[in-house]
């Protein structure tokens, strides 16, 4: 069974900008290890001769004509925005990184 280390979980948490306690690191390492084990078990299933599918039932897609209706101008769309720059919404920076 594959094993993911506590350090690997800590690395993933850091990349995801998550602050995890020692208990959470241990618990998530165990849970991720279980998930990887389940995926490995599924990969072992003999699927020769089975045609690939996206869904077990036949699904029909209903098509309709694409009709252009009245749309907003850029000015109308941005009219109520608190901050705009070059016809774009200005939002607060989330991750603290700069370009």
UniProtKB/Swiss-Prot annotation:
The keyword Protein biosynthesis applies. Coiled coil: none annotated. It holds the Pfam family GatC. Its EC number is 6.3.5.-. It comes from the Bacteria. It catalyses: L-glutamyl-tRNA(Gln) + L-glutamine + ATP + H2O = L-glutaminyl-tRNA(Gln) + L-glutamate + ADP + phosphate + H(+); L-aspartyl-tRNA(Asn) + L-glutamine + ATP + H2O = L-asparaginyl-tRNA(Asn) + L-glutamate + ADP + phosphate + 2 H(+). One of its GO terms (biological process) is glutaminyl-tRNAGln biosynthesis via transamidation. Keywords: ATP-binding, Ligase, Nucleotide-binding, Protein biosynthesis. PANTHER family: GLUTAMYL-TRNA(GLN) AMIDOTRANSFERASE SUBUNIT C, MITOCHONDRIAL. Heterotrimer of A, B and C subunits. Allows the formation of correctly charged Asn-tRNA(Asn) or Gln-tRNA(Gln) through the transamidation of misacylated Asp-tRNA(Asn) or Glu-tRNA(Gln) in organisms which lack either or both of asparaginyl-tRNA or glutaminyl-tRNA synthetases. The reaction takes place in the presence of glutamine and ATP through an activated phospho-Asp-tRNA(Asn) or phospho-Glu-tRNA(Gln). Belongs to the GatC family. This is Aspartyl/glutamyl-tRNA(Asn/Gln) amidotransferase subunit C. The gene is gatC.
């Amino acid at each position: 069974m594959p094993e993911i280390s506590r350090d690997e979980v800590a690395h993933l948490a850091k990349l995801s900008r998550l602050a995890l306690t020692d208990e959470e690191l241990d618990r998530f390492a165990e849970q991720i290890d279980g998930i990887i084990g389940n995926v490995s078990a599924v990969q072992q299933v003999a699927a020769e001769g089975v045609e690939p599918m996206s869904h077990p039932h036949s699904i029909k897609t209903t098509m309709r004509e694409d009709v252009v209706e009245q749309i907003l101008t850029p000015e109308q769309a941005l009219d109520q925005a608190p901050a705009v720059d070059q016809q774009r919404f200005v939002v607060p920076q989330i991750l603290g990184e700069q370009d």
